[in-house]
Amino acid sequence: MRTAAGAVSPDSRPETRRQTRKNEEAAWGPRVCRAEREDNRKCPPSILKRSRPEHHRPEAKPQRTSRRVWFREPPAVTVHYIADKNATATVRVPGRPRPHGGSLLLQLCVCVLLVLALGLYCGRAKPVATALEDLRARLLGLVLHLRHVALTCWRGLLRL
């Protein structure tokens, strides 16, 4: 049997909807209404937007509710659709940064030429000049050989 003090205590009463909501707020934090959320702008608005409600007329048919969906793609990834029979989506990912100094071979050639020019300037011109003449002769022979190979390939392609 319950006593009068036990019946009045809050533990003995069954939970109402209002008490349940208070318990949820304590557990999950306060519920924020939509107007407060839009003013605050901390939470993004819903992506499902309803169209403006029309005035209800008794003779008019009920109109279907249309929804507009707003999507925002991240700026780092852009999706491009290929205009082909099969419309597949490809993802473009930013590539590796390229060096601004040019190719490594070009840089090495510039360094070699600078060393040779420094050698000529310092007075050891005779051995360096002989080496440069030999290098020039070998490069000329290589260029002539490459030209001969290219012309032979071209003639072979014209015969086909």
UniProtKB/Swiss-Prot annotation:
Compartment list = Cell membrane
Q: What keywords sit in the KW lines?
A: Cell membrane, Membrane, Transmembrane, Transmembrane helix
| Primary subcellular site in the record, as a coarse category | membrane
Region of interest called Disordered, as start-end residue ranges on this chain: 1-69
Q: Which residue stretches does the UniProt record annotate as biased composition, category Basic and acidic residues?
A: 12-25, 33-42
Q: Which organism is it from?
A: Homo sapiens
The membrane topology noted for this protein in its Swiss-Prot or TrEMBL record is: Single-pass membrane protein
Annotated protein name in UniProt: Nutritionally-regulated adipose and cardiac enriched protein homolog
**Lineage: superkingdom:** Eukaryota
Q: Name one GO cellular component term.
A: plasma membrane
For this protein, the record's Pfam families field holds: DUF4658
| InterPro entries attached to this UniProt entry | DUF4658
Looking at the UniProt entry, the stretches that span the membrane are: 101-121
